[in-house]
């Protein structure tokens, strides 16, 4: 059974023949083309067309055999068809070789068929018979027109080969772990069927028939797995991927190169080392061009040696290009895919979905250019080596007869509509010929060479141009290409770095921390996040038991002086950090420290009660506290020691337990902490026992327990009420909307910024610590309750403001009005900065740097430079480099001033602190090895989370002393609703300025450019020609050139 030409099975070309009628149309077209070339007296074109027609007839014959069309009518027609084609070919060759060109021209130009040569009439008659037989064959096979044909032209199976000689992670299988075999299922079935093996299930196929795994494919990782790379094609690559493949060079680097400035510096440093040698080689070639008398074989060998030395120095650059960490772009593709492979319950709303798809479609062109550059880099290096080898040969084209005269893809099928007289000749000559005049440098040819050149022309029409006689010229051109491609590599690495930063910056400014986390999933270095200057380095999984501070030693000494029955039992299981805080410990040790009455640690108490749910379940936590309340006395105590233990330890611990419980239920209780097993603890009974024992605070504890668990209904500790102004905003009273350019420009920027600040600060004050924890923990520890309503409202308001700003600009058709709007919004952003409203300021500049606005060249030209400089300074303040270092320094200088901070920084800090640090510490005792990985809680991670939460709460304490304008607040709130998302705005942007050429950058010195930088230059108009010019093809065989006119 033949293997059918299925798009699901092979990497097919657009012009591949799949159905019978496709082949029939293609054959008929070549028949017409052959006849036309014959009558046009174009011998070269005719031979090309006849050759291609013969190949198609051969395919027809093969198809009849593979499809087992064995009827007698088919056989007879095929035999006659092949016989007629042979006669036509012989007679046509006799016609072209037995008659002079002028005679053929005169005969072919005769319109009266009877006045033509008998030989030509015989040839045309034979061809008419061929026409008839072909139509007859088509008629006989008409019932099989829609039959899928067997695959005749060589094609690669899908998912079994990368189709390239360098590393491209985007061509890897996405779900390798779900594959039952190393080779694709459909490929196994197809090959098994062709081999005569019938198996409905792949597992039924014998193991010996399955083949071996393709190392070039199976070694590839899923987007979140560690990279395992082979150094592919420093020059050569083994593409077969079979088990008996030859040895290849494996990269010694185990980790990929990150997309950052350090990697770019490595490439630049390597290029700088190569530039000096390369310039010297170009200089030597120029000297030889200027004076051929200096030619010597020794000089050629020296240049050859320098070439190999240069290429050896290029290997690190190729290694970097092959091992760049593109995980963020892989994750972007997976997130934009409907069948995404992330195991987590990823909640992506419509706005995020649109943002991801827009980013993916925009970045795809840049990534495509990057891979084209990689291929061009490999091509240039290969050509550089071959040209250098030519220098050592007496005749540099001595191996030319070994090469195929036909270019690659000569017999590839083409669309019939694209086949004409001109491109048929181009197909013969190859599509790689470029303008010779652009490639040649001017130099005076040697007179003797010219004489020999003309003699060769008279003897053979297939000749070389003047470069045949001057290899130094070819070598110099190769050096120039090599020099240029090194610069091109640096340019593309830098562009990928910027695109990565822009993608993360936009996500951060839009406060999409969940998207940021998923984009960075699996990236090398993900998790080692530094939340700021004061934060400690990320925790490692290994700590040492003797990492105590001096203060801790003194406190421990005081504990040692106490009687054994008054000492804490689990002190040895506490780990102290350098900042005199608890870094980690066992659950028992942490609870013991929490309930100790001698050394109160308020920060520890707050941190524990806020983050306890990441350590215990609610029932487990309260059970530990009840156990502490009911401490058992140590053994072998006398009466006096027992009384001392009760007085100095038991009663203080009981008071401390009641105090912790009361504080927990009163200030830190959250509805999501409720669990079915809580009822088994009988908390009301526990509180009543404490009252009977006259424990301080027990009455208040019972009151809190009854309030929280009254009538079986769990109630939250606090029920924040929304302010009147927010209720007004949410009711959407009918009022004036800022829906026109005139209405927006009519509002004073100071008034607009003031009311924005009032509105956003009120929403900010509604954010609770539980909102923040729910945002980063999701449903990891607690049930979803409310889904962070306060925080979601704040983020939604900022994103709506961004969409409103950008939409207000792109919907305006008049360029001058758009320029006024841009200036107006820049002034509003500046006043927001003066009011310390960094949230609104960031939302506005994010809109102005978004792709629909950033690409408006003519509009930005109409904005005065001073205003653009103002936007530049605002954007520089929110530069995400070094983790928003400029913004963080500005925030620290505010002290007690009112402020609406940019929440995206807090979300990033919370997300990366939680995801980038382990939940548990591994305790190592010197050389004794590792013990119990999950025994010691990483409490330092929880402390850092609380540090961030405290800063969030700090800015809720100080309020603005501004006068509210309810009309403006109402209009702002209502105007932010029902705004089109970024994709729709981008289409409007293309309408108002459809063909941008050169982008006017409002912030030319900042790296925080829109992630759509130069994207408009990559639209469909002119994209193909740009790529073709940027990555020119070259040929390693003889250069063809149109011959000078020679008298016939």
Swiss-Prot record:
The lineage of its organism: Eukaryota, Fungi, Dikarya, Ascomycota, Saccharomycotina. Residues 212-224 have a biased composition (Low complexity). Residues 748-995 form the Ras-GEF domain. It comes from Saccharomyces cerevisiae (strain ATCC 204508 / S288c) (Baker's yeast). One of its GO terms (biological process) is small GTPase-mediated signal transduction. Pfam families: RasGEF (PF00617), RasGEF_N (PF00618). Keywords: Cell cycle, Cell division, Guanine-nucleotide releasing factor. Promotes the exchange of Ras-bound GDP by GTP. Residues 578-710 form the N-terminal Ras-GEF domain. Residues 1010-1032 have a biased composition (Basic and acidic residues). The gene is SDC25. Residues 1035-1048 have a biased composition (Basic residues). This is Putative truncated guanine nucleotide exchange factor SDC25. One of its GO terms (molecular function) is guanyl-nucleotide exchange factor activity. CDD domains: RasGEF, REM. Residues 208-242, 419-444, 997-1048 are annotated as: Disordered.
């Amino acid at each position: 059974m033949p293997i059918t030409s299925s798009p699901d099975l092979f990497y097919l070309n657009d012009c591949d023949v799949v159905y019978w009628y496709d082949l029939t149309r293609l054959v008929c077209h070549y028949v017409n083309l052959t006849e036309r070339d014959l009558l046009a007296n174009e011998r070269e074109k005719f031979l090309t067309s006849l050759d291609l027609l013969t190949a198609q007839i051969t395919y027809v014959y093969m198809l009849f055999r593979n499809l087992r069309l064995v009827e007698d009518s088919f056989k007879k027609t095929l035999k006659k068809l092949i016989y007629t084609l042979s006669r036509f070919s012989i007679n046509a060759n006799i016609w072209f070789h037995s008659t002079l060109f002028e005679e053929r021209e005169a005969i072919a130009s005769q319109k009266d068929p009877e006045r033509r040569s008998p030989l030509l009439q015989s040839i045309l008659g034979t061809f008419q018979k061929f026409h008839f037989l072909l139509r007859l064959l088509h008629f006989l096979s008409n019932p099989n027109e829609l039959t899928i044909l067997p695959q005749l032209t060589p094609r690669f199976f899908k998912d079994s080969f990368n189709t390239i000689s360098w590393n491209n992670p985007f061509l890897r299988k996405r779900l390798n772990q779900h594959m039952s075999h190393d080779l694709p299922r459909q490929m196994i079935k197809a090959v098994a069927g062709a081999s005569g093996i019938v198996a409905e299930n792949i597992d039924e196929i014998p193991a010996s028939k399955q083949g071996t795994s393709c190392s070039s494919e199976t070694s590839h990782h899923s987007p979140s797995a560690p990279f395992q790379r082979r150094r592919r094609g420093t020059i050569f690559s083994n593409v077969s991927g079979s088990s008996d493949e030859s040895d290849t060079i494996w990269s010694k680097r185990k980790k990929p190169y990150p997309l950052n400035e350090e990697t770019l510096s490595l490439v630049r440093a390597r290029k700088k080392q190569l530039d000096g040698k390369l310039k010297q080689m170009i200089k030597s070639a120029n000297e030889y061009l200027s004076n051929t008398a200096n030619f010597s074989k020794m000089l050629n060998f020296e240049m050859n040696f320098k070439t190999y030395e240069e290429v050896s120095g290029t290997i690190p650059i190729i290694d970097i290009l092959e091992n760049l960490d593109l995980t963020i772009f892989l994750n972007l593709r997976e997130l934009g895919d409907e069948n995404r492979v992330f195991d987590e319950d990823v909640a992506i709303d419509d706005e995020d979905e649109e943002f991801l798809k827009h980013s993916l479609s925009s970045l795809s062109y840049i990534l495509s250019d990057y891979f084209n550059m990689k291929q061009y880099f490999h091509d240039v290096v290969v050509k550089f080596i071959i040209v250098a080898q030519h220098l050592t040969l007496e005749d540099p084209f001595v191996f030319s007869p070994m090469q195929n005269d036909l270019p690659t893809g000569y017999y590839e099928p083409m669309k019939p509509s694209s086949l004409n007289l001109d491109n048929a000749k181009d197909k013969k000559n190859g599509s790689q010929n470029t303008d010779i005049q652009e490639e040649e440098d001017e130099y005076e040819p040697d007179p003797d060479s010219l004489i020999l050149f003309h003699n060769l022309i008279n003897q053979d029409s297939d000749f070389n141009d003047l470069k045949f006689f001057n290899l130094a010229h070819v070598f110099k051109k190769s050096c120039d290409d090599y020099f240029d491609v090194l610069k091109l590599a640096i340019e593309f690495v830098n562009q990928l770095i910027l695109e990565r930063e822009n993608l993360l910056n936009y996500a951060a400014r839009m406060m999409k921390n969940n998207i940021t986390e998923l984009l960075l999933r699996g990236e090398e270095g993900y998790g080692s996040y530094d939340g700021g200057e004061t934060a400690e380095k990320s925790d490692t999984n290994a700590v040492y038991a003797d990492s105590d501070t001096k203060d801790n030693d003194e406190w421990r000494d005081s504990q040692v002086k106490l009687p054994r029955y008054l000492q804490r039992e689990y002190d040895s299981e506490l780990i102290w950090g350098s900042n005199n805080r608890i870094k980690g410990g066992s659950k028992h040790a942490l609870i013991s420290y929490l309930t100790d009455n001698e050394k109160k640690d308020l920060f520890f108490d707050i941190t524990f009660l806020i983050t306890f749910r990441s350590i215990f379940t609610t029932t487990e936590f309260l059970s530990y506290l009840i156990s502490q309340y009911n401490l058992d006395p140590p053994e072998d105590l006398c009466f006096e020691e027992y009384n001392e233990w009760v007085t100095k330890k038991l009663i203080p611990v009981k008071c401390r337990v009641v105090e912790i419980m009361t504080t927990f239920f009163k200030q830190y209780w959250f509805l999501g902490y409720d669990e079915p097993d809580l009822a088994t603890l009988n908390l009301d009974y526990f509180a009543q026992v404490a009252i009977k024992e006259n424990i301080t605070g027990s009455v208040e504890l019972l009151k809190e327990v009854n309030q929280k668990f009254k009538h079986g209904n769990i109630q939250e500790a606090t029920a924040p009420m929304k302010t009147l102004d927010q209720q007004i905003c949410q009711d959407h009273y009918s009022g004036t909307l800022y829906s026109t350019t005139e209405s927006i420009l009519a509002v004073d920027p100071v008034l607009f910024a003031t009311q924005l600040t009032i509105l956003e600060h009120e929403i900010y004050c509604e954010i609770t610590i539980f909102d923040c924890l729910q945002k980063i923990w999701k449903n990891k520890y607690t049930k979803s309750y409310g889904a962070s309503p306060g925080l979601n409202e704040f983020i939604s308001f900022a994103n709506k403001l961004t969409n409103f700003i950008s939409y207000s600009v792109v919907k305006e058709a008049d360029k001058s009005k758009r320029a006024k709007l841009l200036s107006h919004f820049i002034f509003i952003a500046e006043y927001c900065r003066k009011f310390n409203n960094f949230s609104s300021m960031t939302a506005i500049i994010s809109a102005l740097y978004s792709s629909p606005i950033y690409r408006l060249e003519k509009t930005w030209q109409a904005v005065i430079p001073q205003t653009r400089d103002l936007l530049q300074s605002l954007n520089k303040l929110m530069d995400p480099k070094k983790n928003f270092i400029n913004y963080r320094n500005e925030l620290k200088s505010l002290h007690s001033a009112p402020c609406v901070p940019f929440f995206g920084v807090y979300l990033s800090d919370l997300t990366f602190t939680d995801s980038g640090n382990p939940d548990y510490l591994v305790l190592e005792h010197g050389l004794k090895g590792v013990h119990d990985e999950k025994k010691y809680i990483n409490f330092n991670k929880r402390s850092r989370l609380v540090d961030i939460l405290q800063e969030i709460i700090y800015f809720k304490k100080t309020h603005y002393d501004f006068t509210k304008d309810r009309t403006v607040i109402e209009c702002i709130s209502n105007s932010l609703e029902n705004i089109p998302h970024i994709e729709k705005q981008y289409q409007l942007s293309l309408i108002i300025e459809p063909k941008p050429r050169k982008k006017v950058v409002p912030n030319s010195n900042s790296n925080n450019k829109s992630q759509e930088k130069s994207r408009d230059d990559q639209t469909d108009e002119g994209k193909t020609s740009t790529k073709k010019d940027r990555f020119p093809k070259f040929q390693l065989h003889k250069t063809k050139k149109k011959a000078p006119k020679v008298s016939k």
